[in-house]
A protein has these predicted regions:
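General N-terminal targeting signals
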Residues: 18-20, 25, 79-80, 111, ...
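Short alpha-helical interface elements
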Residues: 31-32, 79-83, 123
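Catalytic cores of phosphodiester-bond-cleaving enzymes
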Residues: 39-112
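Short, structured coil/loop segments at alpha-helix boundaries
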Residues: 8, 12, 55, 87, ...
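An N-terminal structural lobe/cap that precedes and organizes the functional/catalytic core
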Residues: 1-62
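C-terminal, charged low-complexity interaction regions
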Residues: 115-242
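Low-complexity, flexible helical/coil segments
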Residues: 30, 89-94, 211-219
């Protein structure tokens, strides 16, 4: 096994440019769905959070070639807040990268929150989110340059015509100005879309040739909890997914 950085090291150089890191030190809190503290550390240390749950061959092989390297020219401009147009291939790469990070994040909990074996196998073979997963992107223009939350077994109420209750792997990533929401339900369900003025679906692909980021509306500090809790019911206890 090797050390896999939850937030890849190439991101740190970009985040160092963010002026929101200047001034008084901030503490990054990584929490689960019940608000239980997973990790607490300054942004300068966030990049060093690692898990030893990834094999060396995967970490230095397909994860690097198929996800990390292709994702850098896609996500890098978004972290900086620059306009970015994503074609379908880029949408799929970014969605796959986000799903990979969500799965890795589950293992930094104490105790670790195991990810379903079939999801891990799917990522290995396809480097894309599992078929029943959803990934959305947004733009965050708050005071905090980084925010991460992760939970395996979150209770979700999904608008699929009638509301459908499921349990899911869930994660939120705020990296600079880029915001990503990942939701992996345990059962196949078609989720009706939230308003596209602030949130854009990456996965499953919408069929649009290109999508433009950022969307018309930004997420600020006041709206961030709404994005974090999108479709989730924090009042319900989680349950193991594996």
């Amino acid at each position: 096994m090797s050390e896999e950085h939850v937030i890849p090291r190439w991101v740190s150089k970009i985040l160092a440019e963010d002026r929101r890191h200047s001034g008084r030190p901030q503490v990054q809190r990584m929490v689960d769905r019940q608000g239980h503290l997973v990790r607490e550390l300054p942004p300068s240390k966030l990049i060093n959070v690692v898990t030893r749950r990834v094999c060396k061959v995967c970490n230095e092989g397909w994860m690097e070639r198929k996800l990390e390297r292709p994702c850098q020219p896609i996500l890098g401009p978004m972290i900086r807040g620059w306009d970015k147009t994503l074609d379908q291939s880029e949408q799929a790469v970014l969605a796959g990268w986000a799903a990979k990070v969500a799965m890795v994040m589950a293992y930094i909990h104490a105790p670790p929150q195991p990810v379903k074996r079939e999801w891990l196998d799917w990522m290995y073979w396809h480097q894309r989110p599992p078929a029943n997963w959803y990934v959305w992107m947004a733009s965050c223009n708050g005071q905090r340059p980084t925010y991460f939350s992760s939970d395996a077994g979150a209770h979700a109420s999904l608008p699929s015509g009638p509301m459908v209750d499921v349990y899911a792997q869930a994660a939120t990533l705020i990296i600079g100005y880029a915001a990503l929401k990942i939701l992996g339900p345990t059962s196949v369900v078609r989720v009706e879309e939230p308003g596209r003025d602030a949130v854009i679906r990456l996965w499953p692909l919408t069929g649009e040739t290109t999508v433009r980021w950022p969307p018309p509306r930004h997420i600020d500090d006041r709206r961030l909890p709404l994005f974090v809790d999108m479709f989730l019911d924090p009042g319900q206890p989680p349950r193991p997914l594996s």
